[in-house]
């Protein structure tokens, strides 16, 4: 069985997407058990192919999403760890980060926000990076720069790579001054 889904201006857990087109293949569930009142379960992995377009305004509108905020905080922790900070997750617990503005340029994403420390003092934080696909599962953030007060959070990294995992296969990634577009595949495995 196969399912095709297409949407314009979709919102998923607070994330706004300009356009989404996905196809799910090999969908096998425990329908017989579901009809008997049991929980729905996947019987085999589902292979999802799709294209997602995210315009600058979509990302701007998604900045308050808890899903995006959590992902950005996790990314910042990875970046701090790569820059030899110890206990980056614990360090970030001392700050409340609110992302307020996003900017797309050719091959560059920039985020501007505010950083509130435990004394309730507020300062600015900036994160900017280029996005390059190294292979189907590795995304390079290069060059990457974080500027913040306190100054110990200021750093730059070159060629920082994010392994997206074996379940992800990105075939195309493009970024210009108006949108980010991604084509790829995802495998959803049963529990």
Q: Where do the protein language model's features map onto the residues?
A:
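Extracellular/lumenal and peripheral-membrane lipid-interaction modules
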Residues: 1-191
């Amino acid at each position: 069985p196969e399912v095709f889904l297409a949407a314009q201006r979709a919102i998923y857990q607070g994330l706004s997407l300009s356009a989404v087109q996905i196809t799910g293949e090999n969908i096998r569930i425990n329908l017989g058990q579901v009809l008997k009142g049991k929980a729905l379960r996947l019987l085999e992995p589902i292979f999802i192919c799709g294209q997602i377009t995210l315009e600058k305004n979509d990302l701007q509108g998604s900045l308050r999403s808890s899903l995006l905020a959590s992902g950005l905080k996790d990314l910042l922790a990875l970046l701090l760890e790569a820059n030899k900070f110890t206990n980056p997750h614990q360090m970030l617990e001392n700050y409340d980060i609110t992302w307020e503005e996003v900017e797309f340029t050719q091959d560059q994403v920039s985020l501007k926000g505010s950083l509130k420390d435990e004394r309730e003092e507020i300062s600015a934080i900036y994160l900017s990076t280029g996005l390059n696909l190294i292979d189907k599962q590795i995304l390079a953030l290069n060059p990457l720069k974080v500027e913040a007060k306190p100054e110990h959070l200021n750093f730059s990294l070159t060629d920082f790579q994010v392994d997206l995992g074996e379940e992800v296969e990105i075939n195309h990634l493009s970024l210009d001054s108006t949108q980010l577009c991604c084509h790829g595949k995802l495998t959803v495995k049963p529990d």
